Structures are given as C-alpha cells and as structure tokens.
C-alpha cells in the first residue's frame, strides 16, 4: 500500500461522539451529522470519522468514534446543539494513504494500512487518534474515496 508521512495541522471539528461497534455507530453518526449540518446550515470544510481505541484490544461495545465535519477555529455550536460537540483532531506526524472503499468494507483498508506501516517498521503513536477524511459522496457514487490518517512517531 502506498502512503506518505507528513505533518498534519490541528483540525477543529463539530459533530457527534459515539460509543459502540464502529460498523453500526459510524453510519448512524453520519446520518445524524448530515441532518444536523442541513438543519443548522453548518458549512463543513471536510467530513471526517475519528477512531479511538484498538478494535483488536477493545470490546466492540466500548469502541469510540467521532463523526464530525471540520470547521473554522471560531465556530460555535448552535444554541440547540442536539448533543453535538466541538473537538480537535491533534496535529502531528501522520502516515496518510488514499484508498477507494467498496461494499462499505472500511475495515479491510485499515487493516492493510496498519500491516504496511508495521511491516515498514513504523511506530504508531497511541496518544493520538486515527481518522479518515471523505473525498466524495459514497452514498451517491457507490464507493468511498478516503484519506486514512494513522499517527506515527
């Protein structure tokens, strides 16, 4: 798998924090996020999923994720935030790979990316979260083009 390592600036984000199996919570979170963005006329810079924890070590019901849009640093939540949060995605060195995901099989792409990094002797930074940036509307296109980000030391 092709990837590059580069410094990524901090991102400001707004959206929803979820707990549970990613294959269930992330799609639900994006449905909630799309509705929230539309209802509050939020102007997203990017659509992003942030993943916390290691699914090989953490039980599925305890996995955490954020479904968010990146926003300007001066963004403020609407008064009726409907459970939305603001958060930041940490700056630092990240390995970044661009992939096309078919059949909603995001896990396979992530596993291949981790295997490539570990095979190349890269050290993953557990203090920062992994995240993916969506480059297209997979609901209408039938596939997802994403940039996967894994924090490295």
Curated annotation (Swiss-Prot):
Keywords: Cytoplasm, Stress response. Gene3D superfamilies: Regulatory factor, effector binding domain. GO terms for cellular component: cytoplasm. The keyword Cytoplasm applies. SUPFAM superfamilies: Probable bacterial effector-binding domain (SSF55136). It is found in: Cytoplasm. SMART domains: AraC_E_bind (SM00871). InterPro entries: AraC_E-bd (IPR010499), DNA_gyrase_inhibitor (IPR050908), DNA_gyrase_inhibitor_GyrI (IPR024911), GyrI-like (IPR029442), Reg_factor_effector_dom_sf (IPR011256). The keyword Transcription regulation does not apply. One of its GO terms (molecular function) is DNA topoisomerase type II (double strand cut, ATP-hydrolyzing) inhibitor activity. Belongs to the DNA gyrase inhibitor family. PANTHER family: DNA GYRASE INHIBITOR, TRANSCRIPTIONAL REGULATOR YGIV-RELATED. Interacts with DNA gyrase. Inhibits the supercoiling activity of DNA gyrase. Acts by inhibiting DNA gyrase at an early step, prior to (or at the step of) binding of DNA by the gyrase. It protects cells against toxins that target DNA gyrase, by inhibiting activity of these toxins and reducing the formation of lethal double-strand breaks in the cell. This is DNA gyrase inhibitor 1.
